[in-house]
Amino acid sequence: MEWKIVVPLFAVAFTVANAGLIGGPMDANMNDQGTRDALQFAVVEHNKKTNDMFVRQVAKVVNAQKQVVSGMKYIFTVQMGRTPCRKGGVEKVCSVHKDPQMAVPYKCTFEVWSRPWMSDIQMVKNQCES
């Protein structure tokens, strides 16, 4: 008789534990336009803050998540690297140097808060380490 109560309770607990928190961060699809736009915004803002004369680009997306808040918060962990393109240049495509000594790779965490109905997007975290 007790197993009729215990088994369903375990099933519910297992389902809730594997579903993640409602409203918590979840994996973001890099093929989603909103995710790509948020990452591009983060890279542009990051480049505005660097003292380097060369543009930095994403070499690799390590992790991408999104969270429903009052809008959408995107959380990216990325490997960044230097490109041969100078800031203010006219180049449209700037790939990260293949040579690690030229690319000077480093890891960053970016958080972007997007509220499209207000035409508002903000960088809320721009933290990098060598």
UniProtKB/Swiss-Prot annotation:
Annotated motif Secondary area of contact, positions: 67-71
GO cellular component terms attached to this protein's record: cytoplasm; extracellular space; vesicle
Location of this chain's protein in the cell: Secreted
Alphabetical UniProt keywords: Disulfide bond, Protease inhibitor, Secreted, Signal, Thiol protease inhibitor
A GO term, aspect molecular function: peptidase inhibitor activity
Disulfide cysteine pairs (residue numbers): 85-94, 108-128
Matching Pfam families: Cystatin
Superkingdom of source: Eukaryota
Matching PANTHER family: CYSTATIN, CYSTATIN C (AMYLOID ANGIOPATHY AND CEREBRAL HEMORRHAGE)-RELATED
Primary role: Cysteine proteinase inhibitor.
Family of this protein: Belongs to the cystatin family.
Stated name of the protein: Cystatin
Organism listed in the record: Oncorhynchus mykiss
Lineage, broadest ranks: Eukaryota, Metazoa, Chordata, Craniata, Vertebrata
